[in-house]
A protein has these predicted regions:
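Acidic, glycine/proline-rich low-complexity segments that act as flexible tails and inter-domain linkers
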Residues: 21-74, 127-209, 231, 238, ...
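Substrate/cofactor-recognition hotspot
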Residues: 113, 122-125
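Ordered, small/hydrophobic-rich secondary-structure cores
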Residues: 45-112
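Bacterial N-terminal signal peptides
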Residues: 6-15
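Helix N-cap / loop-to-helix initiation motif
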Residues: 73, 107-110, 208, 240-244
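Sec/Tat signal peptide C-region and signal peptidase I cleavage site
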Residues: 16-20
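Short, structured motif recognition centered on aromatic/hydrophobic residues
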Residues: 76-85, 114-115, 211-220, 249-253
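Positively charged n-region of N-terminal signal peptides that target proteins for export
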Residues: 1-4
């Protein structure tokens, strides 16, 4: 318990230093209102509805405090929020934030790729749920479907392309993890990862590798995938993301996933950064 309290204190101390420009409640309120209007086009803190007190707490915290933490752009914040909600399968909230993402400049192709990126992490059925939700937003906005194709590989090139990406981002792959799997089928899983994850998905257009790595870390944070968070820290660094950007991304996830999952990811970032 003492360890958890200590970690919380460290996280909060870092957040407070990043939000030094917010000096009183009125500053927080004004920032909240501005961000909310930019994202959704409406008014925050209306005091209306069935639970106005909780909505005030939620909106001030997310849009007045979390949105002021770190060096992320509004586009990055909304892509992170959308991929977190897709991973959690909180589809009504995903629909709202998909609209917000478009409002702050995320293109339809980028948003679709954010959804497609979830497939290797959470499986095809849940990815399709998220895609269907985002497609509803596209249709409501008159965006014609299907969108422009973004595939970059063929049957002949997917392995070579995937291996090139994997070797650059994760030298050594997962060979040691799959050693000893019965029937030698660990080798099949290794090839699936290379061909499907890196070849079919990571090579696609619209999102660059740096963005894919950052968003992937947010998925793993949401899933509390401790082992993969260690390795994907280095994948992010190899792609050009700084430890500070990774930290800000995890904090952006925090209001949606809660403190325990976020603190675990922040602890891992701290451990890997210190090595």
């Amino acid at each position: 318990m003492k360890k958890v309290i200590c970690i919380i204190a460290i996280v909060l101390a870092g957040s407070l230093s990043a939000m030094a420009q917010i000096t009183d409640n009125m500053d927080r309120i004004e920032v909240c209102k501005q961000n909310y209007h930019t994202l959704f086009g409406g008014e925050a803190l209306t005091g209306q509805g069935t639970d106005p007190e909780m909505m005030d707490i939620l909106q001030k915290f997310i849009f007045g405090e979390v949105f002021q933490t770190g060096d992320l752009t509004l586009k990055q914040r909304e892509m992170i929020t959308c991929i977190t909600l897709a991973t959690m399968q909180t589809l009504p909230q995903l629909k709202v934030h998909a609209g917000a993402a478009l409002n702050v400049g995320v293109t339809p192709e980028e948003l679709r790729e954010v959804m497609y990126l979830t497939a290797p992490f959470i499986g095809f059925p849940r990815m399709l749920n998220a895609v269907a939700t985002v497609n509803e937003v596209f249709k409501e906005r008159g965006i014609s479907l299907p969108l422009e194709k973004q595939g970059a590989v063929t049957e002949k090139t997917r392995h070579e392309t995937g291996k090139a990406i994997q070797d650059k981002q994760y030298p050594g792959g997962i060979a040691t993890v799959m050693d000893g799997v019965p029937g030698g089928m660990g080798e099949d899983v290794e090839q699936f990862l290379t061909d499907y994850f890196f070849g079919d998905i990571y090579s696609r257009g619209a999102l660059d590798l740096q963005t894919r790595e950052l968003l992937g870390y947010c998925i793993l944070t949401t899933l509390e995938a401790e082992s993969q968070l260690h390795s994907h820290y280095h994948g992010n660094i190899n792609a050009g993301n700084s430890p500070e950007t990774l930290t800000a991304a995890v904090i952006q996830c925090l209001p949606y996933i809660g403190f325990p999952a976020a603190i675990m990811a922040l602890r891992i970032i701290k451990e890997e950064y210190a090595k």
